[in-house]
Amino acid sequence: MNQIDLQGRVAVVTGGARGIGWAIAQRFLQSGAQVVLWDIDAQELKQASKTLAAVADPVAGAGVVHGQCVELTDDAAVARATHDTLATTGRIDILVNNAGITGGNGLTWELDTEVWRRVVDVNLIGPYLTCRHVVPAMLARGYGRIVNIASVAGKEGNPQASHYSASKAGLIALTKSLGKELATRGVLVNAVTPAAAKTAMFDQMTQAHIDYMLGKIPMGRFLEVEELAAMVAWLSSEECSFSTGAVFDITGGRATY
């Protein structure tokens, strides 16, 4: 594993109690950061914090993990979480907007309206709200790294997943706009567009859709969460210094543009 220096940094990872978020949190801890998990599931959050604490090696405040239960689609809840995190850690250097849902699969005209709205709320409105409250704290210090976990579905549009694809396309556009707005302020904003990784999100999909996604990947396998965590770690570091509003592909050759 290549060493990426996040020593002394404070990172917020949304949806950090499982899957991709957990792997990112683990990589951050191994790189010396303090990590704050924001997640809606209190039980999984408690377990993840405990497991990650065992991975951490606290030295001078590094490798510390905190957990906070947050409904990321609620503006007031995100405001409180931001306030509480700043009160606990003193600052937020890194924000990873990872929390997301698929909403199942179905033809666009047959998908439930409320499910469609919920997917957009979690996958797009949630990251907007976290940026809305965290960015001012980053600007006050003149430094920040924001990484949005989008999806190749946002670039290509997956059939029978219009709600998910549209929400991730919106997140890509949010990244581009915010990246331009903050380009001269010391806060860099980038997105990653991974192919599918085997996580609990597969439980929300049909087997036919899972097979479709695998068939689109030239490397013939799904993404490993550790591979994505490695890319996110670099994007969250000072070494990422001249990329903002950009979209980084990690799809095993599916998207080469």
Sequence positions of predicted segments:
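Substrate-binding pocket helix/loop in short-chain dehydrogenase/reductase
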Residues: G106-T108, D112-R117, F202, M213
